[in-house]
UniProtKB/Swiss-Prot annotation:
Protein's UniProt keywords contain Repressor: yes
Cellular localization per UniProt: Cytoplasm
Alphabetical list of Gene3D superfamilies matching this protein: NAD(P)-binding Rossmann-like Domain, Winged helix-like DNA-binding domain superfamily/Winged helix DNA-binding domain
Record's protein name: Redox-sensing transcriptional repressor Rex
DNA-binding region: 17-56
């Protein structure tokens, strides 16, 4: 199957949502799904679904719909969800602790293998209820050496985000999901995905205000 390498970011961000929808269809024993059914489940229009799918070659036939099992497996392959992906979490503050206790593996094949914080943090040397150990950040390089871990969730204060990012890159991390509302400088080959909760809330409030004006 030919896959277009220039997939727009908006499409890429919907991939996990498509995967979730097809898993739900499969659980409901739906065998075929039309672009309209997929669009309705996603809250988007069917033209967007067809355009997104066009980047991945021929996924279905016009008038026949999409094979649910085939597409579920396709997105599982695309998102590497056949084997467990281990990640680390850095920053055990309020957001970090909440994520440490979130059961990612109940929904997808990913899990937090270790947590890290400043060496003097009270949580260092302890384990969560799910047996996730928390270590001092100074040991991150040796802790993930000889493991398959290349991904980190970053939930540290903004003023420390770049410094910690540099440590993670030196340790071999290639992908960072950052909750710090600052731009992180990273070398080519390292990918940063930012989650700015304040910005997302402000965007929500903006659209709510536009609704009131209408």
């Amino acid at each position: 199957m030919v896959i277009d390498k220039s997939i727009p970011k908006a499409t890429a961000k919907r991939l996990s949502l498509y995967y979730r929808i097809f898993k739900r269809f499969h659980a409901d024993q739906v065998e075929k799904a039309s672009s309209k059914q997929i669009a309705d489940a996603m809250g988007i229009d069917s033209a967007t679904v067809r355009r997104d799918f066009s980047y991945f070659g021929e996924l279905g036939r016009r008038g026949f719909g999409y094979d649910v099992t085939k597409l579920m497996n396709f997105f599982a392959d695309l998102l590497n969800d056949h084997s467990t992906t281990n990640v680390i979490l850095v920053g055990c503050g309020n957001i970090g602790r909440a994520l440490l206790h979130y059961r990612f593996h109940d929904r997808n094949k990913m899990q937090i293998a270790m947590g890290f914080d400043t060496d003097d943090n009270a949580l260092v040397g302890t384990k969560t209820a799910d047996n996730i150990p928390v270590h001092g950040i100074s040991s991150v390089k040796e802790r993930i050496a000889n493991t398959d871990i290349e991904t980190a969730i970053l939930t540290v204060p903004s003023i420390h985000a770049q410094e910690v990012t540099d440590q993670l890159i030196e340790a071999g991390i290639k992908g960072i999901l950052s909750f710090a509302p600052v731009h992180l400088q990273v070398p080519k080959g390292v990918i940063v995905q930012s989650v700015d909760l304040t910005s997302e809330l402000q965007t929500l409030l903006y659209f709510m205000n536009q609704n009131h004006l209408d």
